[in-house]
């Protein structure tokens, strides 16, 4: 017993086991029929889990779903976090239904972002707990306090640094490639040694490669394989043998080559061996020596280490000359429309007018071309048969071979009274001295006369055509009908005069129709609302018209409808048309009783099949005259069928007129009306048959007892509203609307009343206004569509759209106000008043977005809640401690109820959540050199701002290679007028070319530098969705004890459903359930993803942008060009000569500020691969087949375990590629992808220099000069100098300095005094820098910065120093030349200091002495001996003679 008690005590003392974590606080509970599964997740600041605790009551079993959170970063609230899209703190939030989703937050505490350029570290500083994230080429994140540093180690860093609410994106490059440094940092070497090794890596590689080749050759020399090198050494040995035999002095003792420092050898060059020098000399002098053996020497070289070492050096140099360094290789290289709603209103109106004139233009076009073709045909016929045409005016006389005018012509046999007198005016005398010959001029006057008549007729036809086109429509008699008291037959729809009908009227909205009718004075301004309310479709318009209970109102609406569809009744002229479909279908779908008995009668065939309609009148008059006798019911049915068909054919006023005739039993008037319709449309056979049938039925005796259908009574007009005051209030109006006003800019309304007025034209009730204020002088305004709201500050005041009184009441026009004053009006209670209730407001909410917005005319801090309502909130950072993460107070301390703001009032929002701003590098161009000095000497090494001297800002980092170019244009006595130069530059970012501009005589005049500052193509991408790995699964499930699973399982948007039947069994059922192999477990699920990757789709076509700059010594200017449009200015003429076309991928992914391309799913596509789970607007979408299991508990509900919901193939995203040449610029909601490493083509440039009067330049010039320089040594920006030169004449001056100057020659003019130079110094020049301009020596003051930055910041689309260096120096030997040899000599320079010159002189002297002794002296001695031999030979020859 004691043991049992001890066991119970121990068991009770042990803590209760809890899954996931112990303790924690409940953040939300949700009793529901559906249970959630147990989920345990971790975010950046906490852990959260969900549990389902079942509760049973009288109505069933319910689940108390609970969410519990435990903080891991307990003080994260100190950084004042706020929600923002793309934030770097991931927090799991709990929804009202306990569904979990991931949200992004950032801290609101202040944070300073900087970059230490001397240590290549990002510096972050804050006063409290804060969080940072670095994304891009370096990815790091974490929490910190005070100050932290993040070291950069990539050669070129493309980064987005985020700390608190600030984000900055920039591009930074080191002054050397960092792959070597990163590799050595992983070893035991100290950082300084690693940096030194990498700085000298080129010479180290050269020496190492030389040693490796030497070792290889030394090993090969031990074997016969070394003789493979003989083809290399044989030419060398042969050349040496030639030089040996012919050019070297011989030793007097042995006969070999002179060897002052060694003894005579025993081996001859031919291979023979002698013991003494005398025998060797005898062998050489007697001619027995065959000479130098090149093959033997080559074999010796193959085995010797000396030639091997020389060969290794040469081979290493050759290899490194043609091999590109790995560090400098670049990996991965290898339209405007407008929517209709975007157009302004005047353009839309213009489009409508164009449509209205379209038919007229087509008609005019057809008639004009017809006239043209007719004129051409007449011209061709006239040309071919012109004599027949001209025969009208003149005749040809064969007797006298002349043409005679027919006017006054008289014949005398074969002769006429005008013989010997031609139409051309020439006479022929009887003597035959003047003989006439028929020529072209004889009939020219008649041709002209005929052409004149033809042109007159042609112009007359054109005038008739144009006059017919511009002819206006006739007037309308609609106004006459409005003046009648009651309806007449000629005031019904078919008989209204609509004037000229144009088909484009159908495209006009009823608003335009109302405007047209008001312009014709046909309606009042108070009638416009009833016309604009007509539905656009014909069926709806006819129903709307028939609903009108007053003749004048119905006539007005019908006339408006017929004005729009002006061919509605003209379609009745024949047997088809869109307006006849309804009544013809109605007839064919209903049968006449008589036709059932007599189907072959002509009338019945006409009604059913459209046959025999012309003989239908005598048919039923003879064949069916006895059918209706004693059959009143059948008579009534058939006549009602015919009248109903007529009703469907003629709706509106026609049907109302027929209804009035039927109610009055005015059968004669009815038949007269139908006969008028038949007379108006004589070609409509079926309509004629129906009307004749109605007339026939009227003549039968059964007509006296005819009962028409009840619907005709609904078409009768009601009494006039003016005579029935109960339509308004039942008493006289207490408001004096004669004194009504309608003021503008009124936002509040007291005593709001509805107003009804009668139109003076149609009598329609005009109820589009409300009245405010006192009855004696009410203010009337347009009736709001959304009602009025009670003000939140004064309950007696009413506002529009919301309770804040921000919207102005719309004043009515003066025309409407005048009509109201002249009309009879009543006030009635306004029904659409929304009183203020506390339930409409809120003290706190889960924030969706926050920021500052334009609210009406004010700038308010606004918070958008998760229910998409907007509230005024001045804090936006105060948490509601009674709620979970994400709930913010709308007022300080959540004490005041705030009411929502209508979204219409909100505009131009600077959202902090959905549209976070990302800063860029600030580039400041400083115009004055003194200000530039001040800017760079402040040592702002941690600033993200760049300061550039304006006059040299467009120069490259490295001095370009110059080429000579000659000026072109007209040469004069003074020089060249309008001079220019032409050249071509590759469109590659960072390319620079220097031009040494010469005159045509070859005289160097000045230097100009062309620099491609940026060259890229880019596109803008819009975000589609986010994706990421699945971190958990949201689940809701339920179970049934018995029965099948539901056919349709309720689920939320984006959730997948699952179900399994026959889940109830013994030991696996809830309490009270007794079932075996029955029941169901079902539910829905959704993945919880961690957003790691965002997918974007291309929204714009590729845009190519190139910025080309020209820099002189006194000015600089740039131009932006594209492949389409050439640039022509006073300074530049630039265009693309060749264009390379590239394209960016359609869909890209962005992860950690890095672009990834590959197989990525589009929005709404869920195929296997990256992006088949998509989060859009806070909802996760995907597809798949959920997999789940359940655990059974005795007398309890099952524990559902969902193992998989969506098919998430996020692992495929890890195989996406990251192009090295792409750069990324993030903006609010979009990104811009830029490729800047492609050659976009070739730019043809024409630089206009103006008038260069170089022939007047002086050779010597007096210059008053001073200079000022600022910059740094061995840095990115180098030294910038401003020279102030004063001279009275123009001159071309060379520039000389101890440092490297970018411009070697400048033009000096009297009008320009400020000149700028960029200078590169490798050594500190002292307090002044000596610059020589022409013959003037300038001691420019120096302001040097001691900082040694190793990293350079640059805008995203511009190149850095390391990039230009790689482009300039692409081989290892180039690196050795620029850096290696200098590095070798650097230790000696540091050792000897200022005496380095003496040391270099000593070394050079020793080398020169050795060359003299071993090279020059033997050659000189050989030359001396040769000259002596020639002299001895000369003396011997002279003795012989």
From Swiss-Prot:
This is Envelopment polyprotein. Glycans are attached at residues 57, 490, 1177. One of its GO terms (cellular component) is virion membrane. Residues 222-305, 387-452, 1417-1441 are cytoplasmic. Glycoprotein C and Glycoprotein N interact with each other. Pfam families: Bunya_G1, Bunya_G2. The record marks 473-474 as: Cleavage. Residues 14-200, 327-365, 474-1395 are lumenal. The chain crosses the membrane at residues 201-221, 306-326, 366-386, 453-473, 1396-1416. NCBIfam families: bunya_NSm. One of its GO terms (biological process) is symbiont entry into host cell. Specific enzymatic cleavages in vivo yield mature proteins including nonstructural protein NSm, glycoprotein C, and glycoprotein N.
């Amino acid at each position: 017993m004691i043991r049992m008690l001890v066991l119970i005590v121990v068991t009770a003392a042990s803590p209760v086991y809890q899954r996931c974590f112990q303790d924690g606080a409940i953040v939300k509970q949700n009793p529901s029929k559906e249970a959630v599964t147990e989920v345990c997740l971790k975010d950046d600041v906490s852990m959260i889990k969900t549990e389902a605790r079942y509760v049973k009551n009288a109505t069933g079993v319910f689940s108390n779903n609970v969410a519990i959170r435990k903080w891991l970063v307990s003080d994260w609230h100190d950084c004042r976090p706020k929600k923002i899209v793309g934030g770097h703190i991931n927090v799991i939030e709990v929804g009202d239904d306990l569904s979990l989703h991931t949200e992004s937050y950032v801290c609101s505490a202040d944070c300073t972002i900087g970059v230490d350029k001397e240590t290549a570290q990002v510096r972050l500083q804050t006063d409290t707990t804060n969080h940072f994230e670095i994304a891009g080429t370096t990815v790091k994140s974490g929490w910190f306090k005070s100050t932290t540093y993040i070291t950069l180690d990539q050669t070129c860093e493309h980064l987005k640094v985020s700390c608190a609410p600030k984000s900055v994106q920039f591009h930074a490059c080191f002054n050397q490639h960092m792959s070597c440094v990163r590799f050595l940092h992983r070893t035991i070497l100290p950082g300084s040694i690693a940096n030194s090794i990498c700085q000298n890596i080129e010479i180290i590689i050269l020496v190492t490669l030389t040693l490796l080749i030497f070792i290889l050759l030394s090993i090969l020399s031990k074997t016969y394989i070394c003789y493979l090198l003989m083809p290399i050494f044989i030419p060398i040995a042969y050349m040496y043998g030639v030089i040996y035999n012919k050019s070297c002095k011989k030793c007097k003792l042995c006969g070999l080559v002179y060897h002052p420092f060694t003894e005579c050898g025993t081996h001859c060059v031919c291979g023979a061996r002698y013991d003494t020098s005398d025998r060797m000399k005898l062998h050489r002098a007697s001619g027995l020596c065959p000479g130098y053996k090149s093959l033997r020497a080559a074999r010796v070289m193959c085995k010797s280490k000396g030639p091997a070492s020389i060969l290794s050096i040469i081979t290493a140099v050759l290899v490194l000359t043609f091999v590109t360094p790995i560090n400098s290789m670049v990996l991965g290289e290898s339209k405007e429309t407008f929517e209709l709603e975007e157009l302004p209103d005047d353009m839309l109106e213009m489009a409508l007018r164009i449509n209205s004139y379209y038919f007229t233009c087509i008609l005019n076009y057809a008639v004009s071309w017809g006239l043209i073709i007719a004129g051409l045909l007449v011209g061709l016929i006239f040309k071919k048969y012109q004599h027949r045409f001209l025969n009208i005016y003149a005749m040809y006389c064969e007797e006298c071979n002349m043409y005679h005018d027919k006017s006054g012509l008289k014949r005398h046999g074969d002769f006429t009274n005008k013989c010997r007198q031609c139409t051309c005016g020439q006479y022929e005398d009887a003597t035959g001295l003047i003989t006439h010959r028929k020529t072209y001029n004889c009939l020219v006057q008649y041709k002209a006369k005929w052409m004149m008549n033809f042109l007159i007729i042609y112009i007359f036809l054109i005038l008739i055509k144009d006059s017919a086109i511009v002819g206006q429509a006739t007037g309308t008699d609609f106004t006459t009908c409005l003046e009648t008291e009651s309806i007449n037959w000629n005031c019904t729809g078919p008989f209204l005069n609509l004037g000229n009908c144009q088909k484009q009227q159908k495209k006009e909205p009823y608003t335009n129709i109302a405007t047209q009718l008001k312009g014709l004075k046909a309606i009042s301004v108070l009638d416009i609302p009833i016309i604009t309310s007509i539905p656009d479709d014909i069926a709806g318009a006819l129903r709307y018209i028939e609903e009108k209970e007053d003749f004048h109102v119905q006539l007005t609406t019908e006339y408006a409808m017929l004005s729009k569809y002006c061919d509605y009744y003209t379609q009745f002229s024949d047997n088809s048309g869109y307006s006849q479909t309804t009544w013809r279908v109605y007839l064919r779908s209903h049968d006449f009783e008589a036709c059932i008995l007599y189907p072959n009668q002509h009338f019945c065939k006409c009604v059913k099949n459209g046959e025999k309609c012309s003989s239908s009148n005598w048919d039923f008059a003879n064949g069916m005259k006895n059918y209706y006798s004693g059959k009143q019911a059948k008579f009534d049915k058939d006549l009602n069928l015919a009248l109903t068909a007529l009703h469907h054919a003629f709706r509106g006023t026609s049907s109302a007129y027929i209804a009035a005739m039927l109610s009055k039993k005015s059968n004669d008037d009815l038949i007269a009306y139908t006969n008028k319709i038949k007379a108006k449309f004589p070609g409509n056979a079926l309509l004629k048959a129906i009307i004749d049938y109605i007339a026939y039925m009227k003549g039968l005796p059964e007509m006296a007892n005819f009962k028409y259908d009840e619907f005709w009574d609904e078409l009768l007009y009601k009494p006039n509203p003016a005579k029935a005051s109960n339509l308004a209030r039942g008493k006289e109006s207490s408001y004096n609307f004669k004194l009504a006003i309608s003021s503008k800019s009124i936002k509040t309304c007291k005593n709001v009343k509805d107003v009804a007025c009668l139109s003076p034209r149609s009598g329609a009730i005009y109820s589009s206004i409300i009245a405010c204020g006192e009855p004696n002088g009410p203010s009337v305004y347009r009736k709001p569509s959304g009602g009025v709201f009670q003000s939140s500050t004064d309950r007696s005041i009413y506002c529009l759209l919301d309770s804040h009184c921000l919207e102005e009441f719309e004043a009515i026009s003066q025309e409407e106000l005048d009509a109201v004053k002249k009309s009879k009006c009543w006030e009635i209670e306004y029904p659409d008043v929304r009183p203020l209730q506390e339930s409409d407001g809120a003290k706190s909410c889960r924030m969706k977005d926050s920021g500052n917005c334009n609210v009406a005319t004010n700038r308010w801090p606004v918070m958008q809640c998760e229910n998409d309502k907007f509230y005024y909130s001045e804090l936006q950072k105060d948490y509601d401690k009674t709620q979970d993460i994400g709930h913010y107070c709308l007022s300080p301390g959540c004490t005041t109820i705030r009411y929502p703001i209508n979204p219409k009032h909100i505009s131009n929002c600077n959202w902090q959540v959905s549209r976070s701003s990302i800063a860029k590098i600030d580039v400041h161009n400083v115009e004055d050199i003194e200000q530039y000095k001040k800017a760079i000497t402040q040592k702002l090494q941690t600033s993200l701002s760049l300061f550039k001297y304006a006059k040299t800002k467009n120069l490259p980092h490295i001095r370009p290679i110059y080429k000579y170019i000659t000026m072109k244009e007209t040469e004069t006595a003074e020089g060249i007028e309008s001079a220019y130069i032409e050249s071509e530059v590759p469109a590659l970012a960072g390319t620079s070319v220097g031009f040494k501009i010469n005159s045509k005589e070859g005289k160097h005049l000045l230097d100009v530098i062309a620099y491609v500052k940026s060259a890229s193509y880019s596109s803008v991408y819009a975000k589609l969705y986010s994706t990421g790995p699945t971190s958990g699964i949201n689940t809701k499930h339920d179970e049934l004890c018995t029965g099948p699973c539901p056919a349709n399982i309720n689920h939320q948007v984006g959730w997948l459903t699952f179900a399994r039947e026959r889940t109830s069994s013994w030991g696996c059922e809830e309490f009270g359930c007794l079932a075996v192999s029955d029941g169901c477990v079902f539910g829905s699920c959704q993945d919880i993803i961690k957003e790691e990757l965002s997918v974007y789709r291309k929204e714009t076509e590729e845009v190519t942008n190139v910025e080309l700059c020209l820099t002189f010594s006194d000015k600089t200017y740039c131009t932006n060009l594209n492949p389409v449009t050439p640039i022509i200015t006073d300074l530049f003429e630039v265009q693309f000569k060749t264009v390379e076309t590239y394209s960016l991928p359609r869909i890209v992914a962005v992860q950690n500020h890095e672009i990834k391309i590959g197989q990525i799913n589009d929005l709404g596509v869920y195929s296997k691969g990256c992006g088949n789970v998509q989060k859009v607007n806070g909802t996760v979408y995907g597809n798949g087949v959920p997999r789940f299991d359940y655990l059974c508990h005795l007398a309890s509900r099952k524990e559902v375990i969902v193992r998989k919901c969506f098919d998430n193939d996020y692992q495929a995203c890890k195989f996406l590629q990251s192009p090295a040449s792409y750069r990324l610029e993030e903006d609010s909601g979009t990104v811009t992808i830029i490729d800047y490493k492609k050659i976009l083509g070739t730019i043809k440039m024409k630089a206009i220099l103006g008038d260069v009067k170089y022939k007047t330049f002086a050779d010597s010039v007096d210059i008053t000069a001073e200079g000022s320089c600022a910059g740094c040594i061995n840095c990115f920006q180098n030294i910038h100098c401003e020279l102030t030169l004063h001279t009275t004449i123009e001159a071309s001056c060379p520039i000389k300095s101890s440092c490297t100057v970018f411009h070697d020659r400048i033009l000096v003019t009297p009008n320009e005094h400020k000149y700028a130079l960029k200078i590169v110094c490798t050594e500190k020049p002292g307090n002044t820098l000596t610059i020589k301009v022409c013959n003037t020596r300038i001691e420019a003051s120096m302001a040097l910065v001691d900082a040694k930055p190793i990293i350079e910041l640059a805008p995203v689309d511009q190149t850095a120093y390391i990039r230009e260096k790689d482009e300039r120096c692409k081989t290892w030997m180039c690196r050795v030349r620029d850096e290696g040899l200098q590095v070798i000599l650097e230790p000696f320079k540091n050792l000897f200091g200022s005496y380095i010159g003496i040391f270099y002189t000593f070394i050079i002297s020793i080398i020169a002495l050795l060359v003299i002794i071993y090279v020059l002296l033997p050659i000189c001695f050989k030359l001396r001996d040769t000259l002596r031999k020639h002299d001895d030979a000369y003396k011997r020859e002279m003795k012989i003679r």
